């Protein structure tokens, strides 16, 4: 299939919400209007020519309704990913759409929990046949890349539970060395990506800066 039914802008933090709490300041990223120096790369768009829809974008309404009009009713809470699997989404990294960032950890956790519930509701689209509108069963039309995106979201949703289970098992059923090793491993999984990202920000600067 050629072309896109959805064009997905990059999502940024709105200025009013950026000063709402320390939680937003720490985890919300950089606010402001600067689409040119903050253009980012996206693995899926760069390698496969297809991005992921996050719920707000530019639609070809007729094509969207034609391709996404056969979902089962009242069965999908988070519809963004499955819609981009059917309709193909192109990322516009130099166009920014601003939205509020959750002001507290509880609000952010609630949002992520809602997203994860939605991801598990579309897990059936990993199978060869899926439920369509009503009770009819259809051949699953989405691509292998789309199925990988669904699987990857499910994998990421299980990481916190798996790490907690690893810590509990190591501390309750293993020796002190295994417990310490498991703790160091989990801390490394959580901290190293953030530390590397922070270090990269310190040692590099945009090419347009003196």
Label the model's feature ranges.
Residues 1-140:
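Internal catalytic domains of large membrane-associated glycosyltransferases
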Residues 133-162:
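Loop-to-transmembrane boundary segments
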Residues 3-7, 13, 31-32, 36, ...:
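Aromatic-residue detector
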Residues 155-210:
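Membrane-embedded multi-pass helical conduit in multi-pass membrane proteins
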Residues 46-52, 71-78, 105-108, 147-158, ...:
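Membrane-entry segments of alpha-helical transmembrane domains in multi-pass membrane proteins
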């Amino acid at each position: 299939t050629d072309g896109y039914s959805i064009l997905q802008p990059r999502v940024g933090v709105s200025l009013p919400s950026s000063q709402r709490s320390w939680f937003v300041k720490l985890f919300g990223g950089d606010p402001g209007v600067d689409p040119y120096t903050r253009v980012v790369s996206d693995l899926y768009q760069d390698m496969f020519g297809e991005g992921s829809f996050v719920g707000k974008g530019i639609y070809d309404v007729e094509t969207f309704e034609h391709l996404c009009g056969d979902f089962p009713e009242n069965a999908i809470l988070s519809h963004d990913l499955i819609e981009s699997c059917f309709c193909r989404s192109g990322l516009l990294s130099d166009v920014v759409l601003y939205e509020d960032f959750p002001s507290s950890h509880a609000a952010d956790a609630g949002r992520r929990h809602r997203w994860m519930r939605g991801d598990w509701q579309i897990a059936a689209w990993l199978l060869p046949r899926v439920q369509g509108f009503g009770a009819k069963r259809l051949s699953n039309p989405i691509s292998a890349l789309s199925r990988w995106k669904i699987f990857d979201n499910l994998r990421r949703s299980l990481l916190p539970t798996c790490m907690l289970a690893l810590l509990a098992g190591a501390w309750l059923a293993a020796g002190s060395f295994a417990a310490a090793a498991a703790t160091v491993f989990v801390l490394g999984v959580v901290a190293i990506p953030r530390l590397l990202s922070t270090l990269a920000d310190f040692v590099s600067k945009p090419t347009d800066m003196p």
